[in-house]
């Protein structure tokens, strides 16, 4: 299967988009490379890939995005995200929705802006909104995590606010996944490592509970969250602690099965495909690979060195 790895560095330091064929044993065969400054995140779309660039361009403080074909050869012109430090996006047909972390907004097609307001209790990280995640729900709404205000918000396709739900103050909601039946949301918190559970229906989330993650390092923070294809297992990565936690999932109940060393430093992103988990360890410039059996992780011997790996996308 094809996998794209994003190196969030300048071109002169090896930054760009790397394409590999990933074999069942975790071995990689390089298939392509596109040089670009500081790619932050990417999603699949009809045009190939839609890619966020964190680096501002042409004396503009805003981030940019562009499209590129799956062979990493043909690109569109850069477009502004209309905000600072874009960090996540989703594509719906011809529409692209982007969140700008520092600007605290959600932007559709570089035109329509939904500006978040408010703050929470963390003295430095929550003095203003910080949108960190956006994705389309199965019923056509757009879910957004606002770390700065501890809020899970839902918008319609024109970015009109549908509903909001709060997580515990100071926890800093970051990313989320839905259960396979669409009835539950599992959202990782960054500032206090933990997972929120919500019941979901028709663009509205009901907060149910938060499961805290025991950490040895008080500076640990939550990063990425993924669900296995069968919906039975939830995976959560923690930076500083440098682990991936594995939970058995049963509706609103999470049961910790394993806490696995990520094999590197700062597992900012990872993804699961079949019986493999691929982890991007940002600060150790290292991609690590894990075999999955009954949900549990076993680290494989092969590794890949890559400068500042920030994102992974399966083709």
What spans do the regions from the language model cover?
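Short loop/turn segments immediately following the C-termini of beta-strands
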Residues: 8-10, 54-56, 101-103, 147-149, ...
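Beta-rich catalytic cores
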Residues: 13, 37-38, 85, 130, ...
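Surface loop/turn motifs at the tips and blade-to-blade linkers of beta-strand repeat domains
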Residues: 32-37, 78-82, 114-115, 123-127, ...
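Residue-level detector of Asp-centered blade-edge/turn motifs that repeat once per structural unit
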Residues: 44-47, 91-93, 136-139, 180-182, ...
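Asp-box/WD-like beta-propeller blade repeats and closely related beta-sheet repeat scaffolds
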Residues: 73-135
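Loop/turn-rich, solvent-exposed surfaces of beta-rich toroidal or solenoidal domains
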Residues: 220-281
């Amino acid at each position: 299967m094809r996998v794209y790895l994003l190196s969030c560095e300048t071109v002169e330091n090896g930054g760009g988009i790397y394409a590999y064929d990933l074999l069942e044993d975790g071995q990689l065969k390089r298939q392509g490379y596109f040089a670009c400054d500081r790619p932050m995140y990417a999603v699949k779309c009809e045009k190939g890939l839609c890619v966020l660039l964190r680096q501002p361009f042409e004396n503009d403080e805003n981030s940019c995005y562009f499209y590129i074909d799956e062979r990493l050869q043909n690109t569109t012109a850069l477009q502004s995200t209309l905000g600072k430090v874009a960090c996540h996006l989703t594509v719906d047909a011809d529409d692209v929705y982007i969140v700008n972390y520092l600007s605290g907004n959600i932007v559709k097609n570089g035109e329509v802006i939904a500006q978040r307001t408010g703050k929470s209790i963390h003295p430095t990280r929550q003095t203003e909104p910080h949108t960190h995640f956006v994705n389309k729900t199965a019923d056509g709404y757009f879910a957004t995590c606002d770390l700065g205000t501890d809020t899970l918000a839902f918008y319609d396709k024109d970015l009109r606010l549908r509903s909001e739900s709060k997580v515990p103050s100071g926890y800093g909601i970051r990313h989320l996944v839905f259960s396979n039946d669409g009835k539950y949301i599992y959202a990782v918190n960054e500032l206090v490592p933990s997972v929120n559970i919500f019941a979901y229906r028709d663009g509205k989330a009901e907060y149910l509970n938060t499961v805290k993650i025991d950490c040895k390092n008080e500076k640990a923070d939550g990063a990425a969250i993924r669900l296995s294809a069968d919906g039975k297992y939830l995976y959560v990565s923690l930076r500083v602690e440098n682990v991936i936690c594995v939970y058995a999932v049963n509706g609103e109940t999470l049961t910790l099965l394993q806490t696995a060393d990520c094999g590197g430093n700062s597992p900012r992103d990872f993804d699961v495909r079949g019986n493999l988990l691929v982890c991007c360890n940002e600060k150790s410039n290292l991609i690590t690979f894990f075999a999955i059996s009954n949900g549990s992780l076993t680290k494989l011997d092969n590794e890949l060195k890559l400068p500042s790996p920030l994102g992974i996308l399966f083709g």
